[in-house]
Curated annotation (Swiss-Prot):
Signal peptide: 1-25
Modification type Proline amide: residues: 116
Modified residues (Phosphoserine): 42
PANTHER family: CALCITONIN, CALCITONIN-RELATED
Protein name in the entry: Calcitonin
Keywords, in A-Z order: Amidation, Cleavage on pair of basic residues, Disulfide bond, Glycoprotein, Hormone, Phosphoprotein, Secreted, Signal
Propeptide: 26-82, 121-136
Disulfide topology: 85-91
Glycosylation sites: 87
Cellular component per GO, a single term: terminal bouton
Function: Calcitonin is a peptide hormone that causes a rapid but short-lived drop in the level of calcium and phosphate in blood by promoting the incorporation of those ions in the bones. Calcitonin function is mediated by the calcitonin receptor/CALCR and the CALCR-RAMP2 (AMYR2) receptor complex.
Entry's Gene Ontology molecular function annotations: calcitonin receptor binding; hormone activity; signaling receptor binding
Lineage: Eukaryota, Metazoa, Chordata, Craniata, Vertebrata
Length: 136
């Protein structure tokens, strides 16, 4: 089962490692400067790569078919998910309600109008400043 879950990246990396081992530790500079003929695959490697790619494509096709079947089963009107999120606005409203609830239950900070600390009375400050100018 695990063999069927190879990703294309893993297959390519295995082939690259195989090619690197077949070169028997040739310095990187000589690999980069070498002719493109060294990068060709043998007939057996080509068949192996084609078989791996074909198996991978079949596996992905089966997974897509299974997902489509599950979506078809899940899209029935009896499904609780379709009842719960039958209308996009209902789902969005639920999401916004949850976010708003998180905002209100978030711990308060000591910044803002209702922050603890010295409270100033603007009217008293204006009277004090006004009286000091007139010398009362």
């Amino acid at each position: 089962m695990g063999f069927l879950k190879f990703s294309p990246f893993l297959v390519v990396s295995i082939l690259l490692l195989y090619q690197a081992c077949s070169l028997q530790a040739v310095p990187l500079r000589s690999i980069l400067e070498s002719s493109p003929g060294m990068a060709t695959l043998s007939e057996e490697e080509v068949r192996l790569l084609a078989a791996l790619v074909q198996d991978y494509m079949q596996m992905k096709a089966r997974e897509l078919e299974q997902e489509e079947e599950q979506e078809a089963e899940g899209s029935s009107l009896d499904s609780p998910r379709s009842k719960r999120c039958g209308n996009l606005s209902t789902c969005m409203l639920g999401t916004y309600t949850q976010d708003l609830n998180k905002f209100h239950t978030f711990p308060q900070t000591s910044i803002g109008v209702e922050a603890p600390g010295k409270k100033r009375d603007v009217a008293k400050d204006l009277e004090t400043n006004h009286q000091s100018h007139f010398g009362n």
